């Protein structure tokens, strides 16, 4: 089972520091967002060509190259609709061909066979390969995909599932169209809970309802299903079964696996985001430093025992400075290692 981290802020802005920590943590994989809206700020003339002038892959190239130098695999998340392709980053592209061709260009660039010449004074080099791909992030959460629900005549349906079926189908088709082989594309990346309340001020979709509707929406092909089984409150351990039937945490991950089995057969499961915030500084959701370290071991044990889980990705290497953000890192915002850092180092891979 691959164990790794997801921390775009540190990986992109403090790359050398981040990879020193990842290497020390014995990370086997790092999740990296390829922001479509940032890479392609204008419509490319030849969208299937990774070298089209509209594309700016500089930051992604650097991170992928550093991961390869440190012998860490990359899980690349394609997310974010550009303004030229749709209304907003968290909206369905107007043309799914645009997303499919971007996914193709990204997978071709990071196929392990693509040659680039950074400048006249630098030699031609081959970019490293990325074999693990993820379509979008938490599409059952309105922060990442809108609208969540839509009314048809007298009934409501989770529009997010229908839109996401198109998104993941486009990413899957684009990545696999390279023909290089070995790539795996995960769909889902679902958040742990949702209210299924279309009339509420902030409607969202529970993961079991979401995956049930994905099948009806026409999603047929994907290589693995991804989920983010976060705890509901700080009193829950990784083994705690949540009270709400709308939540899928690590404690009841079996209900999601059984649902997937009934709809898609025995798909592999990727945990592409997980973590526990600490107190200090988070007094509402945080647990003690010692508890966070203990839960690292417990979460790893649950995931390994499940056997269908291929990876466990912890959210954040370093705490975010703003208290409204996340403090689930294994390093504090001031740069001090928490006990959970040592817990990751001691995990038996």
Residue ranges and their predicted role:
Residues 15-16, 100, 104-131, 150-290:
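Noncatalytic carbohydrate-binding groove/subsite architecture in carbohydrate-active enzymes
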Residues 91, 129-134, 139, 144, ...:
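Aromatic-rich peripheral "rim/lid" segments of glycoside hydrolase catalytic domains that contact
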Residues 19-25, 29-111, 126, 153-188, ...:
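Aromatic-lined substrate-binding rim segments of carbohydrate-active enzymes
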Residues 22-23, 68, 215-218, 304-305:
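Non-catalytic positions within long, well-ordered alpha-helices that form the structural scaffold/packing
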Residues 41-46, 86-89, 145-149, 236-240, ...:
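Short acidic, glycine/proline-rich loop/turn micro-motifs
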Residues 2-7, 28-38, 73-78, 131-135, ...:
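Structural recognition of the beta-strand scaffold that forms the well-ordered cores
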Residues 6-17, 37-41, 51-58, 84-85, ...:
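Acidic-and-aromatic substrate-binding clefts and catalytic sites of carbohydrate-active enzymes
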């Amino acid at each position: 089972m691959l164990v790794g981290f997801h921390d775009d802020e540190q990986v992109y802005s403090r790359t050398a520091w981040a990879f020193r920590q990842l290497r020390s943590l014995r990370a086997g994989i790092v999740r990296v967002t390829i922001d479509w809206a940032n890479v392609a700020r204008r419509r490319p003339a030849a969208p299937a060509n990774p070298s089209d002038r509209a594309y700016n892959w500089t930051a992604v190239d650097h991170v992928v190259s550093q991961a390869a130098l440190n012998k860490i695999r990359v899980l690349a998340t394609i997310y974010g609709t550009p303004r030229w392709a749709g209304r907003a980053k968290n909206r369905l592209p107007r043309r799914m061909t645009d997303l499919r061709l971007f996914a193709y260009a990204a997978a071709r660039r990071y196929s392990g066979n693509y040659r680039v010449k950074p400048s006249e004074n630098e030699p031609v080099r081959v970019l490293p390969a990325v074999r693990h791909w993820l379509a979008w992030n938490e599409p059952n959460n309105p922060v990442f995909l809108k609208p969540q629900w839509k009314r048809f005549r007298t009934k409501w349906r989770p529009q997010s599932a229908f839109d996401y079926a198109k998104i993941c189908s486009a990413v899957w088709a684009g990545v696999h169209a390279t023909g290089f082989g070995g790539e795996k594309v995960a769909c889902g990346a679902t958040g742990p809970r949702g209210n299924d309340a279309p009339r509420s001020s902030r409607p969202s979709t529970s993961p079991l309802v979401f995956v049930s509707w994905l099948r009806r929406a026409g999603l047929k092909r994907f290589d693995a299903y991804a989920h983010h089984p976060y705890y509901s409150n700080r009193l829950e351990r990784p083994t705690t079964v949540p009270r709400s039937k709308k939540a899928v945490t690590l404690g009841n991950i079996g209900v999601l696996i059984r649902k997937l089995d009934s709809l898609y057969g025995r798909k592999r499961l990727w945990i592409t985001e997980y973590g526990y915030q600490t107190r200090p500084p988070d007094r509402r959701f945080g647990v003690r430093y010692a508890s966070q370290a203990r839960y690292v071991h417990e979460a790893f044990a649950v995931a390994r025992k499940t056997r269908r889980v291929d990876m466990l990705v912890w959210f954040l290497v370093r705490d975010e400075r703003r208290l409204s953000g996340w403090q689930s890192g294994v390093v504090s915002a001031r740069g001090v290692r928490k006990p959970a850092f040592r817990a990751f180092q001691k995990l038996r891979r």
